[in-house]
Amino acid sequence: KQFTVKDSMLQDNGKVYITLGGVESAYYLYVNGVEVGYSEDSYDPHTFDITDLLHAKGEKNTLAVKVFKFCDGTWLEDQDMIYDGGIFRDVYLTSTPAVHVQDYDLNYDLNEDYTAADMKLSLNTVNDAVTDAADMAAKVALYDAQGNEVAKTNAVLGTIAAGKAGEKEISMTVTDPKLWDADHPNLYTMVVSLYDQKTGLHYE
């Protein structure tokens, strides 16, 4: 498979990743003739950093996947199932700026009468640049199903050292939360943005 990468994905000091959503049952991944990695476990997605293997903007890149129908985990994985093989879920690219959110964990506690929810967001950030990212902060906003902002907060992250990761605990409260149940499947959308407090430059 050949593909090109959009200019917007090739940001300064950013990263480009490829994710394979599901491949049964094991495979080697190659980009432009270079082995990227090996993976097993058919039903879990796997993500690989391919930034340094990509050609210049506009040039075609070649993706190859060498799939094995059986591996040392097949016996456990395919009990009482039809043995199959191949790519059966989406394959897609994602990109991140130099400073970005790597992972997060969100938990909440409701008060006794369910009229408020105290939210705890554990935010993991990474700086892939060669210089420190100083004066960083995070803006967190929560939206209901109609797109209305129901809660927001800002948190100071400070300096994220070059090539290092950071972690921050952020708290916010949602009043009169619309709870989820089978008859009323209410959902919220959370948006997290990282920005430089001095320049206002947004990274994500």
Model regions: which residues?
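N-terminal carbohydrate-binding accessory modules
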Residues: Y104-D105, V191-E204
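Beta-sandwich strand segments
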Residues: D72-I82, V150-K152, K198-E204
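Extracellular recognition modules
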Residues: A64-K66, T189-S193
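Accessory beta-strand-rich segments of carbohydrate-active enzymes
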Residues: K1-D103, D128, A145
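Beta-strand-rich binding/interaction modules
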Residues: V31, T115-T159, G166-I170
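Short glycine/proline/serine/threonine-rich loop/turn segments at secondary-structure transition edges
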Residues: M9-G14, L54-K60, T131-A133, V174-T189
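Short beta-strand segments of immunoglobulin-like
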Residues: D105-E112
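Exposed aromatic-hydrophobic patches
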Residues: P45-L53, A165-T175
